Design a protein with these regions (language model features):
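Long, charged, low-complexity, helical-prone intrinsically disordered regions
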Residues: 70, 148, 163-164
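A short, conserved structural fragment
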Residues: 148-157
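Short amphipathic alpha-helical interaction segments
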Residues: 134-145
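Conserved small/polar residues in nucleotide/adenosyl-binding loops
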Residues: 169-171
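C-terminal scaffold of the Radical SAM
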Residues: 1-134
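Alpha-helix C-terminal capping/helix-coil junction sites
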Residues: 34, 147-148
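Extended hydrophobic-aromatic, low-complexity segments
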Residues: 125-126, 137-139, 154
């Protein structure tokens, strides 16, 4: 997470902890929550068993979703778009989808890996092959290198980041 300059905290420009301190704090938080019965199911989400966010799963699974209202974002049939943030334009019917982009299969592969590796479920290579009709050998080669350094692990065809691996992409 980052500080946005136009926010009160961003304008104060506080001194933030260095990357190592942030990583140590993150790992300590993961251990504390784990000891207290919370499962770490996504890089910045913890929940008691059975209480994972169902809403966010659509994003992590790259499913279609429709956002309605000013500033709402949608992803439908390989197309990403948003409505204007201006509520008056939205109410008057003048708000048409903007920031439209067609998302290529190649980009969707990258997004699949990016969002799935944020979750404890990880990225299933069989699922990736079936969705995008690609060889996963290059990805698996990278995962094996990460595994040697304790940053990734796998169960069958599913690869996921370890807590140490998550701490590096979290900061």
């Amino acid at each position: 997470l980052k500080l946005e300059p136009a926010t009160p905290m961003g304008r104060e420009n506080p001194v933030l902890p260095d990357d190592d301190t942030q990583a140590d704090t993150y790992l300590a938080m993961c251990r504390l929550l784990g000891r207290n019965g919370f499962e770490h199911y996504e890089i910045s989400n913890f929940a008691k068993p059975g209480f994972r966010s169902q809403h966010n799963f659509k994003y992590w699974d790259l499913s279609d979703y429709l956002g309605l209202g000013p500033g709402a974002h949608s992803f439908l049939n390989g197309r990403r778009f948003a409505f204007a943030r201006d509520i008056r334009a939205y109410i008057s019917g003048e708000s048409i989808p903007q920031d439209e982009e067609e998302v290529s299969d190649f980009r969707r592969q990258g997004e699949y890996l990016m969002v799935r590796l944020r979750t404890s479920d990880g990225a299933d290579m069989h699922d990736l092959e079936n969705r995008y009709h690609v060889s996963t050998a290059p990805y698996e080669q990278v995962f094996r290198m990460l595994e040697k350094h304790g940053l990734a692990a796998h169960e069958g065809t599913r690869w996921y980041l370890t807590e140490q691996g998550l701490s590096l992409i979290h900061i």
